[in-house]
């Protein structure tokens, strides 16, 4: 949805010269052809880098022949989302201060990057910030992966302003503000590189899914802030990595969800939160069975098995990044999103009890 515009002035281009826009790619030649032009046109002097996860299509050839101005980091194997970015950002030039984690299926708009960088410049406590995410297919709608900024409920279930479970809101300007949130989307997130490296980037055990939520939770636990800036807008296709009903995605979401809560929840809240999550996971598995989706039900069982197998690892991570009380940070709904959505029929962020929002 990005529109064309005149090239940026020298002053505008220089303003983002300390930013690297890093696009992780795996067999996405068609997406690169479709979306790289908007990134090149509207990123105002930022360095554009594609980190390729050992693609077997013609992605590397497309970059060399059609986008020679784009730098390439070629991984020798498919490292997944987490390690793909971790290894790529380790190779960035030392003069860079910020990096954008940008999905290959995102179209950016004129002026998208400057407000995000400016917020980081003006607020040293902020370590990550995301723009407003709209849907590429339905430009008037907010998009699943990020929408108007990420929240968590008291059980650690993620949702967004503008997206409760699968229910999306149209964008009427209701989230045009700039404010702290619990998490920023990995579809388009600007990070402060000094903090990224200090916290060792994304959790490699996650491979993909919920990794940005874990990172942002660790940022808050370490005393940093995560923000949303609604004056910056990008358009996301979404669903480009794994199909929505893919058992592999079910496995990653449930396994990573347990690890996310275990790693980051304060000790005083952990036992009750984890017990409730485990119970709800079994309810979800039963629901899959009743619907005939046995592969997804088995995926939940494998997720639990593998979470427990790696429990000593997750314990070490808890010690490495000590959790804080959930209510001590913004972006938290101190109620149950499951109950609000399925029990009370709430479908919009504005319908949630404001007294329970931070």
Language-model features, listed with the residues they occupy:
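Active-site-adjacent helix/loop segment of glycosyltransferases
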Residues: 22, 222-342
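Short, acidic, metal-binding catalytic loop of nucleotide-sugar glycosyltransferases
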Residues: 37-46
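A conserved acidic beta->alpha catalytic loop
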Residues: 38, 52-61, 77
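Short beta-strand/loop segment that forms part of the nucleotide-sugar
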Residues: 45-54, 73-75
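Glycine-rich, basic loop-to-helix element that forms the pyrophosphate-binding segment
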Residues: 74-92, 104-106
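Short aromatic/hydrophobic "clamp" motif used to bind/position activated sugar donors
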Residues: 99
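Conserved donor NDP-sugar-binding/catalytic core segment of glycosyltransferases
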Residues: 107-146, 150-157
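A short, conserved alpha-helix in the catalytic core of glycosyltransferases
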Residues: 176-233
């Amino acid at each position: 949805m990005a529109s064309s515009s005149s090239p940026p002035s020298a002053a505008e281009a220089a303003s983002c010269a300390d930013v690297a826009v890093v696009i992780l790619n795996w067999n996405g030649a068609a997406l690169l052809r479709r979306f790289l032009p908007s990134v090149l046109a509207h990123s105002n002097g930022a360095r554009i880098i594609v980190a390729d996860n050992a693609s077997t299509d013609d992605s590397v050839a497309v970059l060399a022949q059609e986008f020679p101005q784009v730098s390439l980091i070629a991984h020798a194997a498919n490292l997944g989302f987490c390690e793909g970015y971790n290894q790529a950002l380790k190779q960035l030039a030392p003069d860079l201060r910020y990096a954008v984690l940008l999905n290959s299926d995102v179209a950016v708009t004129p002026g998208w990057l400057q407000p995000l960088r400016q917020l980081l410049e003006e607020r040293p406590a902020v370590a990550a910030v995301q723009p407003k995410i709209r849907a590429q297919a339905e430009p008037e709608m907010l998009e699943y992966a990020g929408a108007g900024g990420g929240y968590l409920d008291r059980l650690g279930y993620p949702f967004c302003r503008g997206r409760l479970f699968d229910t999306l809101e149209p964008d009427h300007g209701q989230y045009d503000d700039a404010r702290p949130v619990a998490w920023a989307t990995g579809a388009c997130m600007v990070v402060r590189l000094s903090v990224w490296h200090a916290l060792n980037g994304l959790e490699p055990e996650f491979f993909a899914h919920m990794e940005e939520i874990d990172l942002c939770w660790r940022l808050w636990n370490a005393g940093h802030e995560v923000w949303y800036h609604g004056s910056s807008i990008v358009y996301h296709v979404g669903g480009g990595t794994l199909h929505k009903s893919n058992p592999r995605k079910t496995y990653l979401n449930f396994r990573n969800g347990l690890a996310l809560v275990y790693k980051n929840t304060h000790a005083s809240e952990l036992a009750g939160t984890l017990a409730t999550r485990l119970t709800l996971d079994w309810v979800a598995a039963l629901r899959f069975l009743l619907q005939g989706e046995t592969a997804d039900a088995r995926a939940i069982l494998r997720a639990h098995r593998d979470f427990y197998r790696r429990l000593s690892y997750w314990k070490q991570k808890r010690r490495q990044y000590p959790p804080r009380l959930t209510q001590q940070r913004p972006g938290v709904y101190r109620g149950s999103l499951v109950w609000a959505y399925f029990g009370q029929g709430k479908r919009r962020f504005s319908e949630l009890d404001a007294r329970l929002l931070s």
